[in-house]
Swiss-Prot record:
Record's bilayer topology term: Multi-pass membrane protein
Gene Ontology biological process: photosynthesis, light reaction
Quaternary structure and partners: NDH is composed of at least 16 different subunits, 5 of which are encoded in the nucleus.
Compartment list: Plastid, Chloroplast thylakoid membrane
Residue ranges of the TM segments: 9-29, 64-84, 88-108
InterPro entries reported for this sequence: NAD(P)H_OxRDtase_bac/plastid (IPR023043), NADH_UbQ/plastoQ_OxRdtase_su3 (IPR000440), NDAH_ubi_oxred_su3_sf (IPR038430)
Phylogenetic classification of the source organism: Eukaryota, Viridiplantae, Streptophyta, Embryophyta, Tracheophyta
Statement: the UniProt record of this protein carries the keyword Membrane: yes
Disulfide bonds listed in the record: none
Protein name: NAD(P)H-quinone oxidoreductase subunit 3, chloroplastic
Molecular function via GO: NADH dehydrogenase (ubiquinone) activity; quinone binding
Chief subcellular location: plastid
Amino acid sequence: MFLLHEYDIFWAFLIISSVIPILAFLISGVLAPISEGPEKLSSYESGIEPMGDAWLQFRIRYYMFALVFVVFDVETVFLYPWAMSFDVLGVSVFIEALIFVLIPIVGSVYAWRKGALEWS
């Protein structure tokens, strides 16, 4: 039977951990001095006078590498619990994990063959 009072500590933690950052933002907004001007609107470059525009446009190639990294990073996060309980799980779960690993590998090989990962 599902009883909510069994999770009192969880709800208290959730409420407190939500209220503290909200209060911190509100208090800093009230106490912070409001000063606007050209210095506040310029970009900070370690004390050096900024040269040129602060907004750089990255090439799309960088985003492809970042996307591949994120895909394999998320895959690692999902495979970790499976690896920790590998001895308890059966062969069918092993086959599912193998398919789960093969799909991004096939996608990476496809992207590599198409030249999406070439930096030049």
